[in-house]
Amino acid sequence: MDINSIIIIFFSFLIGSIPSAYIIGKKLKSIDLTKKGSRNTGVSNLTQNTNLYASLPVIFFDLFIKGFLPIFLCSDSIFSLDINTKILCGMVSLIGHNWSFFLNFKGGRGIATLVGIILAIDYNLFVILSGIIAIGYLFSPIKDSALWWI
């Protein structure tokens, strides 16, 4: 593993650890998501405690900056790192999101971040999984975004 790999993996964890929903909740509504609703610091809890419009920048940030960007930086056009490093960057970004060291290792569920990771790794897989998730969500009696398969 070379120095570029180590730097991008560390960068991925730092980016993943930024608690975007928590920050928006504090700035817009002065709410602490770790003490409201489901107590996770993700988009769904932010939406439940504010509104969808407050969640849109968080969805964008989590999907594209936390999920897509670290893997894009590993691509052939930037650092030309192998697929294992790409997957590792995605994993540490997701770990950073789910257990942010900025919030004493509390975080969200990582759904938007994972979608960004899948989109960056394989667009075809993204399309297939999106269809499966949409069908599962439509037919599930539970409408929580993370629990449709239970």
Label each residue range with its predicted role:
Residues 1-8, 67-88, 119-126:
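Helix-coil boundary and interhelical linker segments in multi-pass alpha-helical membrane proteins
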Residues 47-51, 74, 92, 111-142:
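Interfacial segments of multi-pass membrane proteins
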Residues 2-28:
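N-terminal signal-anchor transmembrane alpha helix
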Residues 31-40, 102-115, 142-150:
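Short, non-helical or kinked segments that cap or interrupt transmembrane helices
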Residues 6-11, 56-60, 86-91, 115, ...:
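Hydrophobic alpha-helical transmembrane segments
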Residues 48-75, 89:
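Multi-pass membrane catalytic core of lipid/isoprenoid biosynthesis enzymes
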Residues 22-55, 107:
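Cytosolic, membrane-interface loops and tails of multi-pass inner-membrane proteins
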